[in-house]
Amino acid sequence: MSVVGAINPVPIAPTTRRRVGDSLDVISERPSNSSDYCNTINQPIVGSTDLDGGDATGQDSSPSSESSASSTGSHYHHDHYHRFYSHPVIRYLLLRKFWIPFYGGASTVVIGQGFRSGRNVGRRILGLLMLLVVASVFLRVYLMGGVRVVDHARLKEFVVVRTLRDDWSMAQREVAENQASSQPMRVLEKLPIPEIWQKPESGNYRQCVTRPKNYTRLQRQTNGYLVVHANGGLNQMRTGICDMVAVAKIMNATLVLPLLDHESFWTDPSTFKDIFDWRNFMNVLKHDVDIVEYLPPQYAAMKPLLKAPVSWSKASYYRSEMLPLLKRHKVLKFTLTDSRLANNGLPPSIQRLRCRANYQALLYTKEIEDLGKILVNRLRNNTEPYIALHLRYEKDMLAFTGCNHNLTTEEAEELRIMRYSVKHWKEKEIDSRERRIQGGCPMSPREAAIFLKAMGYPSSTTVYIVAGEIYGSESMDAFRAEYPNVFSHSTLATEEELEPFSQYQNRLAALDYIVALESDVFVYTYDGNMAKAVQGHRKFEGFRKSINPDRLNFVRLIDHFDEGIISWEEFSSEVKRLNRDRIGAAYGRLPAALPRLEENFYANPQPDCICNKSHPEQLRKQSSLRTDSKSWKKSALR
């Protein structure tokens, strides 16, 4: 007893269960200290080895009342509550402190006082159970509101996880969908595209360059090897290579990967493989012509026969003039490739082959294609449209045409000297003013800016300049004053991105080609080789808007506007009227009296490679032309 009392001053009766309950009462009245509870409850009860052997009451314990511990009241409680107190749960509750986590100490006091008296213990236990039920309901609602309640059910050997919140959301969504299904569907209207960005109506025209389904290429021995030296700038070489593919087909020749021009104005040392995806070129055309990387060893050491084909020649020329030479010498080299095949009057299969070569086989290298796509995405920031302006106001073009409008005297003299230094340029003395009035000069940057403004393009329009270095010290100032959002490959790409291409003008021209092809509007101020190639490609891709300004009438109008003869409103209205039908719409290319006067095949591949599917007679006409063309195929085999 003295040992126990030294540890804890709370008096503990040695014999009866009632003393145990009284001890708990005394403990519950002390300050809430977890260490005290542990020390008190965990002490051994002196004089009692069996907790089930005594009885207890709810009376307060005191030393003077120890003699009444064995009164009849004790036996009464022992008789009626023996089973209750002997239950393991109750024994645990009597020896432990109760705690409800969400109401703290207040709940502890309430429950503790519930056991202070042995009277009506059943009611208090019932109340405790009811409290637990209420608490469980509260937790259920609380968890449904924010905590995931996961139920696992085994269904066909799969574990299904259900979340109450998700089930509730699904139910609400199902109700909403059922209600919405009974109402008319609301369709979001697309904002109309402004007219200045709309492409022309393409009608029912479609690409028609595929081979017939029953096409089988005859396996026959080659008549020889054709080596071609493409001349000129990138786009002149590009179209020339496509013509040489067709010529190789006509003569049943094996085409060697073309050689590119390294001696023209640009002096670009790039090879065919540096600019074009040569594997794709060979793979796309493998069912049409045989293409090899190099001459076979037995022919590599031979000196080929050099020939320059006649410009705008028909298939009959190559069959009658060139094919015998090829068969005799086995290796034939063409030193020129530009415009060496007629625009019209060729078999439909040959015309379609030219288109397959240009639009499907001649892809640029992956490095060029990837950077081109990056530049397009930067121009289309937030899906904004942009104009690609082929401003052919470059030194070589101005020297060739003799145009020096708006240039200084020193700059005009520099152009004249350059024109005389190029031997194959036949025209030397040119009246610049007269050439401009005739519409033979490219627009100056100022004229191009005024033209775009008159056509309705706002100053906020993004403009990409498709050209090399613009000639003239102050030529671009007037353009930037009207259109400040102007870019080129040198300002749009980083130095690191341009580093592999910066020293190669043809590779930079390939980048410009991609950006121009993908533009929302393409405007070209002069009918150069790039303008022809890009506008034809855009027609082939679905008649994307390509504006060809009426330069002849524009020169007259802008001079009148500068002189104050007409107002801006009159000037703008007339510019729009004159160029209303010059936006790249569908129309068929027609032959002319002289090949030089014809529209270039690659500037407008319709109707040969773009067909009207709603007109079966056009397809029947092409079928008859294929039948008529069998004769030249037989001659090529002989």
Swiss-Prot record:
GO terms for molecular function: glycosyltransferase activity. Keywords: Carbohydrate metabolism, Fucose metabolism, Glycoprotein, Glycosyltransferase, Membrane, Signal-anchor, Transferase, Transmembrane, Transmembrane helix. GO terms for cellular component: membrane. Residues 61-74 have a biased composition (Low complexity). The chain crosses the membrane at residues 125-145. Residues 49-74, 613-638 are annotated as: Disordered. Its EC number is 2.4.1.-. One of its GO terms (biological process) is fucose metabolic process. It is a single-pass type II membrane protein. Its main location: membrane. Substrate binds at residues 390-392. It is found in: Membrane. Pfam families: O-FucT (PF10250). The keyword Glycosyltransferase applies. Glycans are attached at residues 214, 252, 381, 406, 612. It is an enzyme of class 2 (transferase). Pathway: Glycan metabolism. The keyword Nucleotidyltransferase does not apply. InterPro entries: FucosylTrfase_pln (IPR024709), GDP-Fuc_O-FucTrfase (IPR019378). PANTHER family: O-FUCOSYLTRANSFERASE 28, OS02G0726500 PROTEIN-RELATED. Belongs to the glycosyltransferase GT106 family. This is O-fucosyltransferase 28. It comes from Arabidopsis thaliana (Mouse-ear cress). The gene is OFUT28.
